């Protein structure tokens, strides 16, 4: 994931490709350019049962590389066409690019967006999440989505004991003030490869 979050639990997934969970994880990126085509095939199967799809669970749905490849947008186009529910999780204000798809989907109860906010401290965020949108940009995006009618929530993720746990209430208040109406959290979990 291009955001390069130092605490990311997904870093070891790069080992599957014989790459390092360190710098390789955020610099050797793979775009699934056929994802929309594959999704359309899966949704068309007679055995498929409609259930909300979550994008951005393992790696962010709106990485900077997404400006070029637009994989998430192509997936949203298929989901909108099929009237299929989706939830997005991101740390990037790039999600606003897809308002034209998200608003009509939200009007049908088909789309929600969650913003992961770890801290409101811009300097700390820049160290921990170097290529994710700054916390204030995420809050502005929450406001823009909410004002456009897209249901928005916030994930305080991860909560890092002794580092970001003191920010929990402030994050929830700021997100609520911006328009988030749901919240959750995830405690820090470091795979063995990251503990060192």
Predicted regions and their residues:
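Surface-exposed cleft-lining segments at the edges of enzyme active sites
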Residues: 123-131, 157-160
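Active-site mouth loops of central-metabolism enzymes
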Residues: 64-66, 128-129, 161-164
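Short, hinge-like loop/turn segments at secondary-structure boundaries
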Residues: 105-107, 131-132, 171-173
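TRNA-binding/sensing appendages of the translation machinery
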Residues: 1-3
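Short, well-ordered secondary-structure micro-motifs
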Residues: 99, 126-127, 165-166, 195
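Conserved Radical SAM active-site core
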Residues: 6-114, 118-126, 135, 139-140, ...
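Conserved C-terminal portion of the radical SAM core fold
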Residues: 136-194
């Amino acid at each position: 994931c291009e955001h390069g979050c130092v605490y990311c639990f997904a870093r070891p997934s790069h080992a599957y490709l014989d790459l390092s969970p360190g710098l390789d994880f955020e610099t050797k990126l793979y775009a699934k350019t056929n994802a929309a085509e594959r999704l359309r095939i899966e949704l068309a199967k007679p055995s498929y049962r409609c259930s909300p799809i979550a994008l951005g669970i393992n790696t962010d749905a709106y990485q900077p590389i997404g400006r070029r490849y637009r994989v998430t947008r192509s997936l949203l186009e298929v989901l909108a066409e099929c009237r299929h529910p989706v939830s997005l999780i991101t740390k990037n204000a790039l999600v606003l690019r897809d308002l034209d798809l998200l608003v009509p989907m939200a009007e049908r109860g088909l789309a929600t967006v969650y913003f992961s906010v770890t801290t409101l401290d811009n300097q700390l965020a820049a160290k921990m999440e170097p290529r994710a949108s700054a916390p204030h940009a995420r809050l502005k995006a929450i406001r823009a989505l909410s004002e456009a009618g897209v249901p928005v929530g916030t994930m305080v993720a991860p909560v890092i004991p002794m580092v970001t746990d003191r920010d929990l209430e402030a994050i929830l208040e700021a997100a609520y003030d911006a328009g988030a109406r749901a919240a959750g959290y995830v405690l820090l979990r470091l795979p063995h490869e990251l503990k060192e």
